[in-house]
A protein has these predicted regions:
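RNA-contacting regions in translation and RNA-metabolism proteins
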Residues: 1-195
Length: 195
């Protein structure tokens, strides 16, 4: 079964996807068992695979996610988490849903998500275990589905004008709850007779 998909890449991100001497493109091709052709005039990245192996079924989709993530502002190193982590996924949030057509509103929302010297973005990343990129009119998030859900809620709250303090409190509470859930799971698996 052959696979082919086109991903539109902004011109300023084509060089990042190719990498120095084609290194990044080559790594994605090798790790995902795909062929990548990039048209620098149109910005189209054509990802194709001819593999018929069952284990290779998901690899072309991972390549699509990695290239999409890099095209939305992630560094290749951070985007490789999508290949390395079996449970990791990529989600894109369109900020136009909150800012409308106003460029001033868009800049204000992006500023709230990034924070002063990137503090807000780093705090969300640290408390959720995700990677976050604010690029153009979108926010990209890489992490597990649970991590993405919490980070997405934080981005949505900030986009709707909630205070940073209330967002950080929500993140702290979610982190505390996740820790308790992990401890309960560990106890249930290691001490079933105590229940």
């Amino acid at each position: 079964m052959s696979f082919q998909q086109v991903v539109r890449v902004p011109r300023d991100r084509i060089g990042v996807i190719i990498g120095k001497n084609g290194k990044v493109k080559g790594q994605i091709q090798d790790r995902c068992n795909v062929l990548i052709e990039i048209d620098s005039k149109t910005g189209d990245a054509i990802i194709s695979s001819q593999s018929k192996e069952m284990s290779a079924e998901m690899e072309p989709f991972k390549a699509v996610e990695v290239i999409t993530a890099i095209s939305k502002g992630f560094s290749p190193r951070r985007a490789y988490r999508l290949i390395d982590g079996d449970d990791d996924a990529f989600q894109l949030i369109d900020l136009r849903d909150y800012a409308g057509k106003s460029s001033n509103s868009m800049e204000r929302i992006k500023g709230r998500i990034i924070g002063e010297e990137g503090k807000s973005r780093r705090t969300i990343e640290d408390l959720t275990g995700t990677y976050i990129s604010v690029y153009g009119h979108s926010v990209g998030i890489i992490g597990t589905s649970d991590q993405i859900k919490i980070a997405s809620d934080a981005v949505t709250m900030l986009s709707k004008g909630k205070s940073h303090k209330s967002v950080y409190n929500m993140l702290q509470e979610a982190k505390r709850k996740a820790k308790i859930d992990r401890m309960r799971l560990w106890e249930d698996n290691n001490f079933p007779a105590l229940r």
